[in-house]
């Protein structure tokens, strides 16, 4: 079964031997030591069985599979195996579960953003479905979309960001990430967005319209230094349209901050991302190119 699931796979093991040889890439063999299983806890072993091991694969075989697949040569593969089997370092979930196989991707996290159009929203949904199905954790930025009640087309008005996030919640939950885990994603909104007050309570199970909740998504608020100064000085805070910057609502910065902290205390979220500090720390060549960080990821 293992041969069928791995590309160019050859497994040579004797049941009576503790030292075995696993070959994933042609010419790259890894010597395994099953006595190192004792370094794993019982909980760790059960987790590996449930989510990571391939059919007929043992714990050390998993480490060897990953080491062989991602190595440059036999010596490199053996070193990687030795480090993993001794627990000196451990790859991420997609690498352990998908490395050396034709399933999923070796990447944990993906970031994207929705544009302020129906086409852009549909593109984001479609992309997130495929990413979740391949085992990726997703972070999506929704700050480009106009808030509820803003003009759309000739005479229409938008229903806001939250209904589209709710659809993303349902789509992500519906997609199974192989046999490892369900789809998982986070969505981000800036502190100046017109819907930030409702967005803060996105995961709160009580109060408000249940059709405007997304209980399975994680969510984060992108906070600026200007907002924190407004909180410090007890000033007004302006919620603005992402489309043209027009002020949609004026609130007290401290009231919004207290609401945010209260929700975090009661529900554990939303995440707080202090975006100006993040962008101060990005590499200079990215700054010179005019690049900026807008959001963070799922974890």
Q: Which residue stretches match the model-derived regions?
A:
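Extended catalytic cores of very large enzyme megasubunits
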Residues: 1-299
């Amino acid at each position: 079964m293992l041969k069928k699931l791995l590309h160019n796979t050859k497994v040579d093991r004797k049941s009576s031997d503790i030292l075995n040889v696993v070959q994933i890439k042609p010419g790259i063999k890894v010597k395994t030591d099953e006595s190192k299983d004792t370094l794993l806890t019982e909980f760790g072993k059960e987790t590996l069985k449930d989510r990571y091991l391939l059919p007929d694969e043992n714990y050390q075989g998993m480490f060897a599979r990953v080491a062989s697949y991602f190595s440059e040569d036999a010596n490199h593969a053996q070193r990687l195996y030795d480090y993993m089997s001794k627990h000196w370092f451990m790859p991420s979930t997609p690498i352990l579960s998908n490395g050396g196989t034709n399933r999923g991707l070796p990447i944990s996290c993906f970031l994207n953003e929705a544009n302020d159009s129906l086409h852009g929203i549909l593109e984001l949904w479609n992309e997130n479905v495929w990413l979740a199905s391949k085992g990726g954790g997703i972070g999506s930025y929704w700050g480009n979309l106009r808030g509820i009640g803003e003009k759309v087309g000739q005479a229409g008005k938008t229903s806001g960001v939250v209904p589209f996030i709710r659809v993303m919640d349902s789509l992500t939950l519906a997609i199974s990430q192989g046999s490892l885990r369900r789809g998982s994603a986070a969505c981000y909104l800036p502190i100046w967005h017109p819907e930030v007050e409702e967005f803060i309570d996105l995961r709160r199970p009580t109060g408000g319209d249940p059709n405007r909740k997304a209980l399975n998504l994680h969510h984060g608020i992108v906070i600026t230094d200007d907002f924190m100064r407004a909180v410090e000085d007890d000033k007004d805070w302006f919620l603005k349209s992402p489309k043209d910057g027009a002020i949609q609502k004026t609130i007290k910065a401290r009231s919004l901050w207290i609401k945010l902290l209260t929700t975090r205390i009661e529900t554990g979220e939303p995440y707080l991302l202090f975006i100006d500090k993040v962008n101060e720390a990005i590499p200079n060549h990215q700054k010179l190119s005019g690049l900026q960080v807008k959001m963070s990821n799922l974890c």
